[in-house]
């Protein structure tokens, strides 16, 4: 049986507030579940969605992927874990044509001995400037 102390949820100070009623991270025993994370900043702007010369936002999969994984690392560190504790990654891409660029950045953080991974194409994410969202499961014994 999981005790109350082993089943905690947390919103992380300095990170964008979730766009719904859920925590950034939830502990269940020795496992940590990080909710779907994007490149959204606390001020509701997005890394990797800066405007081009015409003023239109141009989503950049590499910048967004790097920021998403950095946000996940910060969330994990807030509960005493790190990216090395991640055992499963599920990534959601709006455009599978971005897969190679996403994969390149992903490899900056994880190698072939890293977590199990699934990458899924989705029709859209909660904001039109977002092109990637990632959720992870980490194993960090109490």
Curated annotation (Swiss-Prot):
Read off the Gene3D superfamilies from this record: RutC-like
Q: What class of enzyme is it?
A: hydrolase
Catalytic reactions of this protein: (2Z,4E)-2-aminomuconate + H2O = (3E)-2-oxohex-3-enedioate + NH4(+)
Please indicate which superkingdom the organism of origin belongs to.
Answer: Bacteria
Q: What is its EC number?
A: 3.5.99.5
pH dependence of function? Optimum pH is 7.0. Stable in the range of pH 5.5-8.0.
The biological processes this protein is annotated with in GO are: catabolic process
One Pfam family here:
Ribonuc_L-PSP
- Give temperature effects on activity: Stable up to 55 degrees Celsius.
Q: Name one GO cellular component term.
A: cytosol
Name the keywords, alphabetized: Aromatic hydrocarbons catabolism, Hydrolase
Molecular function via GO: 2-aminomuconate deaminase activity
Which cysteines form disulfides? none
Recorded hits in InterPro entries, A to Z, give: RutC-like_sf, YjgF/YER057c/UK114
Reported regulation of activity:
Slightly inhibited by Pb(2+), Hg(+) and Cu(2+).
Q: Which PANTHER family match?
A: 2-AMINOMUCONATE DEAMINASE (PTHR11803:SF48), 2-IMINOBUTANOATE/2-IMINOPROPANOATE DEAMINASE RIDA (PTHR11803)
User: In UniProt terms, what function does this protein have?
Assistant: Involved in the modified meta-cleavage pathway for the 2-aminophenol catabolism. Only active toward 2-aminomuconic acid.
What assembly does the database describe for this protein?
Homotetramer.
Report the family membership: Belongs to the 2-aminomuconate deaminase family.
Identify this protein by name.
2-aminomuconate deaminase
Originating species: Pseudomonas sp
Q: What is the lineage of its organism?
A: Bacteria, Pseudomonadati, Pseudomonadota, Gammaproteobacteria, Pseudomonadales
Q: Which gene encodes it?
A: amnD
């Amino acid at each position: 049986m999981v005790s109350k102390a082993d089943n905690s949820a947390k919103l992380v100070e300095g990170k964008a507030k979730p766009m719904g009623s859920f925590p950034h991270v939830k502990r269940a025993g020795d496992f940590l579940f990080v909710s779907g994370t994007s490149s959204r900043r606390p001020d509701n702007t997005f890394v990797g969605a800066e405007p081009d010369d015409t003023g239109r936002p141009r989503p950049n999969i590499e910048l967004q992927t790097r920021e998403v994984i950095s946000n996940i690392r910060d969330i994990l560190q807030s509960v005493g874990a790190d990216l090395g504790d991640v055992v499963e990654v599920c990534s959601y891409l709006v455009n599978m044509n971005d897969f190679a660029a996403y994969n390149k950045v992903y490899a900056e953080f994880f190698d072939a001995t890293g977590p199990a991974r699934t990458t899924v194409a989705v029709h859209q994410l909660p904001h039109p400037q977002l092109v990637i969202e990632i959720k992870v499961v980490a194993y960090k014994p109490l």
